[in-house]
């Protein structure tokens, strides 16, 4: 297949490229890390569909040629719909119901189109802390004084470890890991979940934090609180104090990670469009740590080394 004859679609933060074919299908191409971007990508989609959560279905695979063909879900992302919608509550309630459904998934092993089994990994302590390290390795060295880098890294790393230790909820559920409205498509009156290749089993509050404190779509505190309340009402059996505790910790760790990822995308991959979202990621971090004693040490350290001016800097 000559990809030059197909329409290249807007991509995501991965090494995948998406093309629209004339056969109501999307060509997903990935030469780099194709195991994750093609094989695992389809395996998780298969897992979601098997558990009655809508996801793109595989039409054909050409793994040896670095691409697969999946169904075309159109261009109507939930992100676009929410930007225009006056009835955000109804949309978010539907999303929360899908999240509750996703968190009931028990499947751990999936047979891939290569006939081997893919085991969905656990979101371990080391994985979460390694992700927080992205903030320290990519963002921090570019914004603070050279002679302060080493000690600040050590200080923040210890704080991240202590925050992880404060997580309360032990139950492990299916976690999409990028559960935000840019990764949801509205197709044939149904919401489809996309970009699911990083799925793991982990803390029940993680995907909720991804959805509510999404850096791509700015929402009011009122909307954020309403979404949280929707989830809380549908999950009344969960210890609500523990849920709030874990939600806030994971939101902060996630948005610190995102600042690191967006910096890496710009510096390493030349994807500078992600830099403009860093100030809002900071805003979300500030909001979550402001009145929570769990974050007192983090708040003081961030205020010492990362000025308000730096956080709101318009990156180019």
Please place each PLM-identified region on the residue numbering.
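Active-site activation/catalytic loop segments of kinase-like enzymes and analogous catalytic loops
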Residues: 133-143, 204-238, 252-269, 281-289
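ATP-binding pocket architecture of kinase catalytic cores
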Residues: 19-130, 168
């Amino acid at each position: 297949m000559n990809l030059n004859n197909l329409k290249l679609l807007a991509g995501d933060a991965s090494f995948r490229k998406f093309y629209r074919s004339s056969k109501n299908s999307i060509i997903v191409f990935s030469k780099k890390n194709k195991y994750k971007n093609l094989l695992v990508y389809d395996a998780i989609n298969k897992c979601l569909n098997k558990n009655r959560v809508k996801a793109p279905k595989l039409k054909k695979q050409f793994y040896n040629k670095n691409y697969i063909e999946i169904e075309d879900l159109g261009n109507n992302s939930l992100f676009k719909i929410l930007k225009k919608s006056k009835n955000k509550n109804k949309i978010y309630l539907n999303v929360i119901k899908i999240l509750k459904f996703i968190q009931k998934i028990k499947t751990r092993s999936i047979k891939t189109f290569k006939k081997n089994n893919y085991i969905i990994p656990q979101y371990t302590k080391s994985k979460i802390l390694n992700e927080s390290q992205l903030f320290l390795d990519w963002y921090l060295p570019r914004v603070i004084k050279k002679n302060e880098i080493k000690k600040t890294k050590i200080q923040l790393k210890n704080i991240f470890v202590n925050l992880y230790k404060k997580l309360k909820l032990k139950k492990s559920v299916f976690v999409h890991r990028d559960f935000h409205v840019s990764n949801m498509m509205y197709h044939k009156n149904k919401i489809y979940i996309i970009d699911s290749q990083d799925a793991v089993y982990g803390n029940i509050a993680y995907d909720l934090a991804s959805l509510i404190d999404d850096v791509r779509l700015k929402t009011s505190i009122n909307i954020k609180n309403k979404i949280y309340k929707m989830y809380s009402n549908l999950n009344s059996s969960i210890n609500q104090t523990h849920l709030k505790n874990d939600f806030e910790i994971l939101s902060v760790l996630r948005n610190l990670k995102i600042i690191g990822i967006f910096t890496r995308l710009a510096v390493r991959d030349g994807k500078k469009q992600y830099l403009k979202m860093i100030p809002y990621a900071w805003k979300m971090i500030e909001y979550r740590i402001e009145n929570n004693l769990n974050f007192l040490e983090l708040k003081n350290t961030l205020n010492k080394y990362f000025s308000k001016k730096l956080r709101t800097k318009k990156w180019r």
